[in-house]
Amino acid sequence: MSVAELVRVTKRFGVRAALADVSFAIGEGEVVALLGPNGAGKSTALAVLLGLRTPEVGSARLFGSDPRAPSARRRVGVTPQEIAFPPTLRVREIVELVGAHFESPLPVNTLVEQFELGAIAGRQAGGLSGGERRRLGVALAFAGRPRLVVLDEPTASLDRVARGAVWSAIRLHVTDGGALLLTTHHLQEAEALARRVVLIEAGSVVSDGPLADLKAAAGRTLVRFRASPGIELERAERDGEHLRLLVPDGGRAVVDLVRAGVPLDDLEVRPLTLDEALASRRLG
């Protein structure tokens, strides 16, 4: 069952189409990463999905309803890119205030513990760092036990420890049957969390499917090995002391290199990471 979907959505700002015939859906218990370069239409897609903008063509649905319906909005938790808090309220007070808007919120102490907010729980919001404000904002998206969480760049400005706490909370949410849609520029994050990737470029969906399929669509394997400066190969890229090859068949490439007498010190043969697959796709 889809908990959220866009159906053939077109959204224009003046003569520019921010979204052009965009469709995708999110199922129960699914983590979907919405990826694309700056200006691709990701934020507009989120705004339409959440009922914050109305498309000229197409529709958005949350739990089968209009996304502006209170019954639908109560089941969604959101962290936008930009978020502000009353500067004199303390972190614990903000968590309590947000939780009071829901019938069955997560206990305050549970949320504080999950997102490691204990050290800042007594501090005023106006004195928080950017990363601390971000962590609080992400935590609040989970306060009402939502069935769908939408996170726009959730771990931007977070350190490794704080990012790990957010990842753990996301995994727990999904284990409990919740769905999650995130945008991120940390492709390692998408790779660690998402089972499915929706790739948007210039307002259109150019790929929608399992992460493994996106990598396979690049049609290439990475072969990397240490090579002295005097060794150069056709289609190989220099990477410091190493050469990198993107090839359809890694095993065959290694055999060919050995037959050609190329020394393969510090050899690495592996599938592309998400970052490498996207770069390979853009380069054709």
Label every model-predicted segment.
Residues 166-248:
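ABC transporter nucleotide-binding domain
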Residues 50:
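Helix-to-loop junction immediately C-terminal to a conserved catalytic motif
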Residues 149-153:
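Catalytic Walker B motif of ABC-type/P-loop ATPase nucleotide-binding domains
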Residues 219-284:
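Short, charged/small-residue-rich alpha-helical element at the C-terminal edge
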Residues 96, 100, 105-120:
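Conserved ABC ATPase "signature" region
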